Regions:
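Active-site microenvironment for binding and transforming phosphate-containing groups
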Residues: 2-284
Length: 284
């Protein structure tokens, strides 16, 4: 991986004057697509959920979540039932959202989204997305903008190869080539901020899939002793590249959630009972 990879960023802010509308970090993956990450601005949630959170699994008030979700759907021009997010559990499980999904009952849909950390679809006017607050969100699209994916890659999912699983499932299911995919790695914790224990380093090293000298370094901790830091941006970049995506097809937002917790939710800064970034992608 070249040393210049971190310069491959796309930071286009879409700022709205109306404070009750979400402010989005948008990604240019093609004119037929809408890809973005929400910021903390533009919603009605309070305290550590302020102000734009649509995740129902982190302790926010249900009415605030409903209002925020409706505001995002209004911005996207879709109905709330066309915004799909899984109940993530740090797995490497990938789910395809197709016509059969919508033909199933609400209970069946909920069950299908349980324990899933990546979604893929070829459906139009359907926004799929994942929730993060330091973990890495990744969005994918093929060059013809026919199929899209959203991936939640925490350290466990990254180590387990969820990005590779998503690429493989996307290509196999829809007869695509990895070389024709584009990817964006969204706001998440940087290596400098992501201090980990020896067990996390060992988990990555044990896979044999990661060049540890490129994704891990030791820095002095607050206590003085050196601790391992893992570069999740680099780990996911390398995984995508190993899958066959050309490096020039992989953009990195370069936004560290830990450093910019005033704009993006960070669980390490705010605690686990706080809001989540929603990173979504849809075919218009």
């Amino acid at each position: 991986m070249p040393t210049s990879w971190k310069n491959m960023t796309l930071n286009f802010w879409k700022t709205m004057s109306d404070s009750l509308k979400p402010q989005l970090l948008e990604y240019a993956l093609g004119p037929a697509l809408r890809a973005f990450s929400t910021t903390r601005q533009g919603g009605v949630s309070r305290d550590n959920y302020a102000s734009f959170n649509i995740n129902a699994y982190c302790g926010d008030e249900a009415d605030s979540i409903r209002q925020n979700k409706q505001a995002l759907c209004d911005e996207l021009g879709i109905e709330p039932q066309r915004l799909i997010m899984p109940h993530q559990t740090h797995t490497a499980c990938v789910r395809v959202v197709d016509e059969a999904f919508f033909a199933s009952s609400a209970a069946e849909q909920q069950a299908a989204l349980e324990g899933v950390d990546a979604l893929i679809t070829d459906q139009t006017r359907l926004c799929i997305g994942v929730s993060t607050a330091d973990c890495v969100p990744v969005v994918l699209a093929d060059k013809d903008q026919r199929v899209v994916a959203a991936i939640h890659a925490g350290w466990r999912g990254t180590q387990a190869g969820i990005a590779a699983n998503a690429v493989e499932t996307m290509c196999r299911t829809f007869n695509l080539r990895a070389a024709d995919l584009r990817a964006v790695i969204g706001p998440s914790i940087s290596m400098q901020a992501f201090e980990v224990g020896q067990e996390v380093y060992d988990a990555f090293a044990a896979t044999g899939q990661f060049p540890m000298s490129q994704i891990a370094r030791r820095y002095p901790s607050k206590e003085g002793a050196e601790k391992w830091h893992i570069d999740l941006w680099a780990a996911n970049f390398l995984t995508l590249e190993q899958c066959g995506l050309p490096m020039e097809h992989i953009q990195v937002s370069g936004v560290c959630t830990y450093a910019q917790f005033d704009r993006f939710f960070s669980a390490r800064r705010l605690g686990i009972n706080s809001g989540r970034i929603f990173t979504g992608i849809m075919k218009k």
